[in-house]
Amino acid sequence: MKIWVDADACPKVIRETIVRAAERTSVECTFVANHVVPVPRRPNIHSLQVPAGFDIADNEIVKRVEPNDLVITSDIPLADEVITKGGLALSSRGELYTKDTIKARLNIRDFMETMRSSGIQTGGPAALSQTERREFANHLDRILAKR
């Protein structure tokens, strides 16, 4: 198992949690973004900078992910592609996407996109709560314990 992080929009506190878990378990972890993502110098922790552009980081993750790899992302279409390839997808808010839940999440995302494109203000996501941080860390620990 490897961990791939869609780091373009990953909160710093979640990146720090991922690094600690990767260090503790010696799992290889790669942060993929279109900008420099500072990561500690460890043999199993890497940063991959891709060119700027729409979905370039996502496409790079999809290209590299293998069955049973874990992808940390809040990007619903990326999570869907990862699950289709046999990987695991966990949001930075602690939601583990599954084959059973991803289609509903895609439908909600598409509906919200339609509303935004028609001029309706939908607002952004709320700030990351302590509960969500804990939920993320707990899910991550459970996934890494099963590998």
Curated annotation (Swiss-Prot):
Disulfide bonds: none annotated. Transmembrane segments: none annotated. It comes from the Bacteria. InterPro entries: UPF0178. PANTHER family: UPF0178 PROTEIN YAII. Belongs to the UPF0178 family. NCBIfam families: PRK00124.1 (NF001095). This is UPF0178 protein VV2566. It comes from Vibrio vulnificus (strain YJ016).
